[in-house]
Amino acid sequence: MQDYSHLEQAIGHAFQNRALLRQALTHPSVGQRNNQRLEFLGDAVLELCVSEKIYEKHPEMHEGAMTQLRQKLVREEKLAQAAQSIHLGDALLMDKSCEATGGRKNPSVLCDAFESVLAAVYLDGGFDAAREMVLRLIGDCSETGDADGKSALQEFLQAQGRPSPCYETVAETGPAHE
């Protein structure tokens, strides 16, 4: 079996069940025993880890803002960056055609692999191990959401106990409206 010690060190977990890690690293292009089911579980584990940390770190934040922050932290781009930081793409098992078309660097593939490995960590080491991986690679969720103007105004008004604003379109300009 391939040596994954560098990857284990990067994610902060030494696997007892190496076959689980191998499955998490197996792209669907290789065969039936791939990482898709683990990806499903990893998505849920990731959302729980991030939600718990946001809840703990931001006691003043209301539900809508917490949801926005979670969406920002678990988006594909962020997970792909985390996967790249530990060279997860290099460890993936995939067929030659997928590799030839840039599969090891594809953000969607990296995001899926990140979630799969997270699920494998969860199954192998429990929730605490999964949480540690998330905190190590995504951060402690201390950043705040960069809300768009409308959302920021609405959140401010809600915090003040005031009614939500009413919006009226005055004009539509730009390339999308020509």
What does each of the following model-derived ranges do?
Residues 1-178:
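Double-stranded RNA-binding/processing signature
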